[in-house]
């Protein structure tokens, strides 16, 4: 199936699924949601509203909130909080400007950040963290550290599936798919939170911009340096309307990963995935 991706009408299929997901068809919608829950083994007792009747559409269900007490955000001052629930695809050090996508598959920071060498240079030999959100997962994205939004770059692209099979077979997948690169200024330096789109994902949404829509001009750069948009660690910054992928980038020698976090391991948002190394704690 993964070999067929380049031949499929990715954007058309995604628009159709996105449209269907907004429909409010009463009992039919509830029946479909129940099938989805059963197929993926979703624990609705974690949801803020476990009753299926609370969700008038698939989109409302996909973007459901969880009970806050089930996802406490790490409290240690220097800790980095996981931005999502999901599976760690890969993580570790950036070798020069090369990141690992999967075994025998690499891509570059420059390509990931829209072919902008000046942005890429800030993360050379830094660290990266890639998490996959499966359809069953909670789809909201949260802030790993306290920070101020300075820029968002929307990069149009393909909509390949980002499931594990595709990641292992589609070259440079994350640098080819549509994505929103969100750059934050933190006490620890620059941090990138990258929201990668995928086939059948209704849309990428951020709390400051709403739905991120491709433009005819191609890459769109949104400057927020004068807006003073700040987030605390653990605050929501966006969501997907299906599963997808989130990538974190940090500059060289600024963080250390939690040794308990390893590729293929599962994570929950708010968990400790690492520690910053520049903040002086009083």
UniProtKB/Swiss-Prot annotation:
Major localisation: membrane
What Gene Ontology terms for biological process does this UniProt record contain?
phosphatidylethanolamine biosynthetic process
Q: Where can this protein be found?
A: Cell membrane
Q: Does the record's keyword annotation contain Lyase?
A: yes
Pathway listed? Phospholipid metabolism; phosphatidylethanolamine biosynthesis; phosphatidylethanolamine from CDP-diacylglycerol: step 2/2
Q: Active site at which residues?
A: 85 (charge relay system), 142 (charge relay system), 244 (charge relay system), 244 (schiff-base intermediate with substrate)
The EC number of this protein is 4.1.1.65
**PTM statement from Swiss-Prot or TrEMBL:** Is synthesized initially as an inactive proenzyme. Formation of the active enzyme involves a self-maturation process in which the active site pyruvoyl group is generated from an internal serine residue via an autocatalytic post-translational modification. Two non-identical subunits are generated from the proenzyme in this reaction, and the pyruvate is formed at the N-terminus of the alpha chain, which is derived from the carboxyl end of the proenzyme.
Keyword Lipid metabolism listed? The answer is: yes
What does the entry comment about cofactor binding? Binds 1 pyruvoyl group covalently per subunit.
Q: Name one GO molecular function term.
A: phosphatidylserine decarboxylase activity
The record ties this protein, via Pfam families, to:
PS_Dcarbxylase
Q: How does it sit in the membrane?
A: Peripheral membrane protein
Identify the GO cellular component terms for this protein.
plasma membrane
* HAMAP family (alphabetical): PS_decarb_PSD_B_type1
Q: Main role?
A: Catalyzes the formation of phosphatidylethanolamine (PtdEtn) from phosphatidylserine (PtdSer).
Q: What is this protein called?
A: Phosphatidylserine decarboxylase proenzyme
Q: Which organism is it from?
A: Coxiella burnetii (strain RSA 493 / Nine Mile phase I)
